[in-house]
Amino acid sequence: MRIIEAINKETIDLKQLRKLAFTGVPDSCLGLRPVVWRILLDGLSLETKSWRNSLEQNYLSYEDFKRELIVKPKVKQDAADAEQQKAKMDHPLSRATESVWNTYFKDQELWDEIEKDVKRTRSDMNFFYLALDAERCKSAADLTRLNRQHDTKKADLKPADIEGYLETHADVLHRILFIYAKLNPGVKYVQGMNEVLAVLYFCFLKDDDASNPVVGHKYLESDLFFNFSNLMIELRDGFLRELDKEKSGIQGRIKQYAEIMKVVEPHAYHTIEQNQVNHQFYSLRWFMLLLCQEFTMAQSIRLWDTLLTDPQRFQFTNFVCVALVSFVRDEIIDGDFACCMENLQKAHEFVPEISDLLNKTNEICVAYNRHEESYTIG
């Protein structure tokens, strides 16, 4: 298999790997896709000899982040020996910026916000609400506990529930997003990041090979954090409101997409314009979430095989989105505002297979003079 040969070298040829992965990473080889995605996301170096050491260093760094950032204020027993000023600053009612309690309250707000979204992640599947240790969770009592955990904020759980807490896949998402937000105060956490992380998590875990040191269980969470962080470097501008009108912001991205549509799908474009449908109304989440909410998890993963290979990330996404509109062109032509919005919002339902969407995208690239090298999807 050529793609396996491509990563079994001391130094990986990134251009070759991108070309091979563009047409889809084979599902038949367990653990292959997570390795390929890590390389494409710069989570693994092109120098394969450095992988083991890099994974271990990232693991240790992430463990430090967890210890330092996921904390609760602790009342000191030797308060009598503490300085009076520090005691005042650490009072629960203190709002001093240096106060441990002030930090705790802000962190709790952030924690609760992320928890609320994480519990809604991928509502079309229950995977993220399952216990990490599936073998430990088989009894009716365990299932009842899991349901109670899901329906109750972690901060509001009773002591008995906390003591017997069953950690779920959603808890891993929660932790990673919280640490990311703490380390990136300029971006913080924005709704939708949970869905992006969920695709990475599902891919890495479900295609896991515990015997492989590169994709084994030990490094899963830390590796997810760093690969998610790398992906967000390229997506973050779309989540920043202050950059909305910049070229790299979400409005800039959507403007580029609309300009392509105007050239290659003029009838659909003019219908949308005539009905004064703001392109943001229907395409905002396409760009922010790399279309992962439009398709099933399996379809999203196949689509991301291609999107992650784009050296001009994520310019290719513009063409995919125009291709998506082409599938509903006949439905919206001569339609009114409501017709346009309804069909554009469910455009994915008109796509038979992801391969059909990508082949249409390739046709649009050629029509728009964005040539790729043999990027026809089989």
Regions found by a protein language model. Name each.
Residues 1-186, 201, 211-214, 229, ...:
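N-terminal transition regions in large eukaryotic proteins
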Residues 13, 17, 28, 32-33, ...:
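Alpha-helical interaction elements in eukaryotic regulators
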Residues 25, 308-312:
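Solenoid-like repeat scaffolds
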Residues 42-51, 203-210, 236-239, 294-298, ...:
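Short helix-capping/linker segments at secondary-structure and domain boundaries
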Residues 48-50, 127-131, 241, 270, ...:
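Intrinsically disordered, low-complexity regions enriched in proline, serine, glycine
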Residues 74-77, 218-281, 313-378:
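Extended, Lys/Glu/Leu-rich amphipathic alpha-helical scaffolds
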Residues 129, 156-166, 179-183, 211-214, ...:
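Active-site-adjacent structural elements in folded domains
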Residues 174-182, 194-203, 226-230, 259, ...:
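Contiguous, well-ordered alpha-helical segments that form the cores/surfaces of helical PPI scaffolds
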